[in-house]
């Protein structure tokens, strides 16, 4: 549990929101002042959507920071959320690199990796629920309440990590649309 990093992420959300608003304004100004067509219009439209995905990733990261600070102890050692976290961070980084390089093949690869992340999230959620069902040995109401809070927090963590992966796929899909005018990954 890295509380310093959690605080850094939470405190960085305001800056991300400010950047989002600045970039959104830039996109609107370009649309209004330049009246782009074809590839330029797709570039601005894709960028407009991508900055929304990045802002939402920032919001999810803030949630994850909050969950980290709220967690009192690791009650589910069989669930490796760090592995899922590493996978989705790599997906976001690769999606942004694909955008910058206009790399169509990387876009498809990112979408393919999302299936593995979804499977990891499903497996992790199943481990949590199975563990909860098998416990049944909490003797006090306080222990039951603490376990329920731990379960809820961990399931939210898993869900938010999975959503970060989905936003990485959205970025890849918008990039594919921008480069190839191909909406294959959008739907």
Residue ranges and their predicted role:
Residues 1-187:
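Cytosolic, long alpha-helical scaffolding segments
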């Amino acid at each position: 549990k890295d509380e310093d990093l959690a605080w850094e992420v939470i405190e960085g959300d305001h800056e991300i929101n400010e950047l989002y608003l600045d970039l959104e304004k830039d996109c609107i100004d370009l649309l209004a002042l330049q009246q782009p067509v074809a590839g330029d219009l797709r570039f601005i439209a894709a960028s407009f959507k991508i900055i929304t995905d990045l802002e939402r990733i920032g919001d999810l990261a803030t949630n994850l920071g909050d969950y980290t600070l709220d967690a009192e102890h690791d009650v589910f050692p069989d669930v490796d959320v760090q592995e899922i976290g590493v996978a989705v961070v790599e997906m976001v980084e690769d999606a942004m690199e694909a955008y910058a390089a206009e790399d169509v093949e990387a876009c498809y690869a990112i979408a393919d990796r999302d299936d593995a992340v979804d499977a990891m999230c499903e497996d992790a959620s199943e481990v949590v629920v199975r563990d909860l069902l098998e416990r049944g040995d909490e003797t006090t109401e306080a222990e039951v309440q603490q376990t329920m809070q731990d379960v809820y927090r961990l399931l939210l963590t898993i869900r938010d990590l999975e959503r970060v992966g989905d936003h990485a796929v959205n970025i890849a899909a918008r990039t594919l649309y921008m480069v190839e005018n191909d909406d294959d990954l959008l739907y």
